[in-house]
Amino acid sequence: MKAKSLTLISITVMFFLFLIYSFNDLFFYSEVKYGDIHEHLDLRMQGIRFSLSHYIIDDKSQLVISEGIYGIGLKMPTGKYYLFPLHSYQSSPDNMARGSLNSLASPLSLYVYEIHNKKNNVVTFFNGDRGFIDVNGETIHLSSLFLGVQGEHIHTSYHDVS
């Protein structure tokens, strides 16, 4: 009986610590350019809720993939976030999920770093390797790293790996 009470108290304390660390307001969007291919990411975290919008457009401005993921996000003291998707949608012209964030894993995990202790310089790293996609015959190795500034579009060039 004493062990059950101690376990219950420990779980309750851990839950409240995770809840305290989860209260944040983060809005981050970034655009990464791989040659003529554009990848865009919007991430909004308010309290423990998150919404993530992601799309990739090819060199002819044709949609490769568009997806939205919504759910609960927990912030850890180390700067790591765990995103637990509760709802998602995905759309692509050929019903292929090339470059999807859903293919990383569920739950998603990411790091949000502040550069030089300034809240407006953000580096986000998604754990996992999203691998390669082929867009119009061009092989592209998708990065798991997004560099950005809150409230602004960031254009970063990456070279394709062939």
Curated annotation (Swiss-Prot):
InterPro entries (UniProt xref): PsaF
Pfam families, per database record: PsaF
Highest taxon above the source species: Bacteria
Name the UniProt record assigns to this protein: Protein PsaF
Species of origin: Yersinia pestis
Organism taxonomic ancestry: Bacteria, Pseudomonadati, Pseudomonadota, Gammaproteobacteria, Enterobacterales
